[in-house]
Design a protein with these regions (language model features):
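Short, aliphatic-rich beta-strand segments
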Residues: 28-33
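Short Gly/Ser/Thr- and Asp/Glu-enriched loop/turn motifs at secondary-structure junctions
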Residues: 23-27
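Short secondary-structure junction motifs
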Residues: 16-18, 65, 110
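Extracellular/lumenal/periplasmic "stalk" regions immediately C-terminal to a signal peptide or transmembrane helix
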Residues: 1-22
Length: 158
């Protein structure tokens, strides 16, 4: 899949532990560790995040027909930062921040993007260990399949 190769090429020089690209059932997932994007307990984006998102945006801008969702994910440790109600709130605010950066800094069309918060409810690993919690704190860009092409495949030929 050309899109996956382009993404891997664009962000290939970044630490593999902090970014993971995978394809599952026709959907492309780009997982970015929270430590690359945000300070702990915050939804303010880091300078490093802008560099990473710029590389992803370059690939997405080259594919104007693709829609995608930005999901914020947290661990299960309760949040105590002022102005943040809980982990679900933090995950939504982080996803919204990423979407805004992609739109305002890199010109991605907001009609192509959805921001969603998953809180601690879709963990990759067990939250009982520090490693598991670190893996669960991430932002995921989900590149959605093009449904019009999918439906064309389902149409019966007459």
């Amino acid at each position: 899949m050309a899109l996956v190769m382009n993404l891997k090429g664009a962000i290939g020089n970044l630490d593999d532990k902090d970014i993971n690209i995978k394809v599952d059932k026709g959907v492309v997932y780009v997982d970015i560790s929270d430590k690359l994007l945000f300070k702990s307990g915050s939804y303010a984006i880091t300078d490093r995040a802008k560099e990473v998102l710029g590389k992803v945006a370059k690939v997405l801008n080259a594919q104007p027909d693709i829609e995608f969702m930005v999901e914020g994910h947290t661990d299960s440790i309760p949040i105590t930062s002022p102005g943040i109600q809980d982990n679900w709130d933090l995950s939504v605010k982080r996803a919204t921040t990423v979407v805004r950066v992609l739109q305002e800094n890199y010109g991605l069309d907001p009609k192509r993007m959805t921001a969603a918060g998953r809180g601690q409810y879709l963990p990759l690993l067990d939250n009982a260990t520090p490693e598991g919690r670190a893996a669960n704190r991430r932002t995921r860009i989900v590149i959605l399949p093009q449904l019009d092409q999918f439906f064309k495949l389902l149409e019966t030929k007459k």
